[in-house]
A protein has these predicted regions:
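Broad phosphate/nucleotide-binding scaffolds in NTP-utilizing and phosphate-metabolizing enzymes
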Residues: 1-253, 258, 270-271
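Catalytic-loop of the protein kinase fold
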Residues: 259-266
Length: 271
């Protein structure tokens, strides 16, 4: 991941030295060419590296140049798709070779791809539309090494503030990512939230489809909606209503349900 970035840094450094300037590692990393390289590499890695890129775009966006924040923001919902042959193999392992017979329709083109897996739309014979999340092969095994590689890139680039101890942050990232890769655990919490909120008018929670859910495939009913970030461009009353509901939900989770959805990725919310 660092080879192309390092080459571009070296070239830019020589150019600046030729102009009598004294470049820093951070200055050399931030030109748009390097930013695009980093974003593209993170998207292709499909695992912990891309997840950390997502967190960078949300958690440190105000501390980074707009160019870096904007490009990293693409990682919130976009990534390289799994090749069709690889997808077929994963679903054969999860559901058996004749899995297509269970569906009235299954779109092999993913609706979205993110850090841990990609999502496909499907339809059951009874008419229910589903969202099927398929985990990338080997992603759980690559978490530790990917987090280490991204940590090295952050240190090389000088993106971390002076004196900032990156180690505990990376340790926590590893722990959380291993939890996210556990789809059976996620299905348990999704079922719990459906029990708590699934029948309320103010919220729409997908319902689990347990007969199609495995350790690396998560099946749920499809709930249409717009990106929550697009609400920023809606009329004021719509923005107020969305904010009120989100704040009320957070308070109910903390003081009523005693269980919270703590992944801050905005791609997890629709309106």
């Amino acid at each position: 991941m660092t080879a192309g970035v390092a080459g571009n840094m070296a070239f830019n450094g020589l150019m600046q030295l030729g102009r009598g300037q004294q470049p820093t590692a951070r200055d050399l990393l931030l030109p748009p060419g390097n930013i695009r390289r980093i974003a593209a590499q993170l998207a292709r890695m499909r695992g912990a590296a891309m997840k950390i890129g997502q967190l960078m775009s949300m958690d440190t966006g105000d501390m980074l140049p707009p160019e870096l924040a904007d490009i990293m923001a693409r990682l919130r919902a976009d990534a390289d798709f799994m090749p069709p042959k690889q997808l077929q193999g994963v679903l054969n392992d999860a559901w058996g070779v004749g899995w297509r017979k269970q569906f009235a329709g299954f779109d092999v083109r993913p609706m979205a791809a993110a850090s841990i897996g990609q999502v496909h739309k499907a339809r059951l014979p009874d008419g229910r539309e589903l969202a099927i999340k398929v985990q990338y092969p080997g992603v759980a095994r690559s978490i530790d090494s990917d987090v280490t590689n991204v940590g090295r890139l952050i240190q090389l680039s000088g993106l971390a503030p002076p004196g900032f101890d990156l180690g505990p942050y990376l340790d926590e990232a590893r722990a959380q990512l291993h939890q996210e890769a556990d789809y059976e655990r996620e299905s348990t919490y999704l079922t719990r939230f459906f029990e708590l909120l699934g029948h309320e008018a103010d919220f729409a929670v997908p319902e689990m489809v347990p007969e199609l859910t495995t350790k690396n495939v998560l099946a749920m009913t499809f709930v249409p909606g717009m990106n929550i970030e697009d609400v920023a461009h809606a009329p004021q009353e719509v923005r107020d209503r969305a904010a009120e509901r989100l704040i009320a939900l957070m308070l109910r989770e903390r003081f009523g349900f005693e269980v919270m959805q703590t992944d801050p990725n905005f791609a997890n919310y629709r309106y």
